[in-house]
């Protein structure tokens, strides 16, 4: 059976994965490749860069996310390709990716949210951040199971044109976050979301930034022209798997990391300083 790269790489049973966000509509960047609806693409505006005042209770968020997840997939019970056992497991998620939309560090109870997911029986909690709030990461009282930082530019000029930050000094904040990664005990990942016409050049500079962060893994991945991203770059402008693999090989040469896995269907390559990835579900 086909499954997400998180299962192939890290042992996560991805039919039991819940994706969610505590910061709907709030982000400090407006990335060209983002599939979400942004104020720009909707032609309306709202304040989306400031931390959410107050914020919902973490337990309420977790319980609401589980209920929404169950409602979303319950109809698969009528699909002859889905077994009763598989559906029953899927209705009981045990992995969460806090990454669906928005910037999670704008939710000021992020540590409590991690703890709440774990207290509700979740085995693994992934967080994906754009790195523009190093202070929030520095103050995390509870670490996730794995921390991702999206680094989608090799230099400040490319960052400005590709990630389109909406706060002052964003590039410097991302650089500060890279320096912070070495202080985390959990596995860390640098994610490069790539589009040939935008941000696939200057691999040497990508390599220098990776060396500063010394992450456990690097994930070069092709951006997808889906959702609202279709308004910003076309399907035929997406990176091919061959281009992503070539990028990964060059990055491996420059960093000393090794390509330890890949998944064609997800258009992604996994590099690491380890010989093999850590199985987070074993």
Where are these regions (language model features)?
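N-terminal [4Fe-4S]-dependent radical SAM core
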Residues: 1-24, 38-61, 65-85, 89-90
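Surface-exposed beta-strand-to-loop junctions
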Residues: 32, 37-46, 224-229
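Short cysteine clusters
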Residues: 20, 27, 31-34
């Amino acid at each position: 059976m086909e499954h997400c790269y998180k299962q192939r790489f890290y042992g996560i049973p991805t039919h039991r994965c819940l994706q969610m966000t505590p910061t709907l509509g709030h982000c400090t960047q407006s990335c060209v490749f983002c599939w979400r609806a942004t104020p720009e693409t909707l032609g309306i505006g709202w304040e989306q860069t400031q931390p959410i005042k107050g914020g919902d209770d973490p337990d309420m968020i977790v319980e609401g996310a589980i209920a929404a997840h169950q409602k979303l997939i319950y109809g698969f019970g009528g699909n002859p390709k889905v077994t009763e056992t598989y559906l029953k497991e899927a209705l009981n998620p045990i992995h969460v990716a806090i990454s669906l939309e928005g910037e999670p560090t704008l939710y000021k109870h992020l540590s409590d949210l991690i703890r709440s997911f774990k207290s509700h029986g979740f085995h693994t909690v992934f967080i994906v951040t754009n790195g523009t709030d190093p202070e929030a990461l520095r103050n995390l009282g509870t670490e996730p199971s794995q921390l991702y930082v999206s680094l989608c530019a090799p230099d400040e000029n490319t960052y400005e044109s590709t990630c389109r930050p909406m706060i002052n000094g964003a590039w410097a904040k991302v650089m500060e976050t890279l320096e912070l990664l070495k202080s985390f005990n959990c596995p860390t990942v640098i994610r490069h979301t790539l589009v040939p016409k935008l941000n696939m050049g200057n691999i040497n500079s990508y390599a220098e930034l990776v060396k500063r962060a010394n992450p456990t893994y690097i994930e070069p991945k092709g951006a997808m022209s889906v959702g609202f991203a279709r308004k910003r770059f076309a399907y035929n402008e997406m990176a091919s798997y061959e281009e992503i693999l070539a990028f990964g090989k060059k990055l491996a040469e420059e960093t000393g990391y090794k390509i330890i896995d890949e998944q064609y269907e997800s258009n992604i390559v996994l590099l690491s300083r380890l010989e093999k990835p850590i199985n987070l579900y074993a």
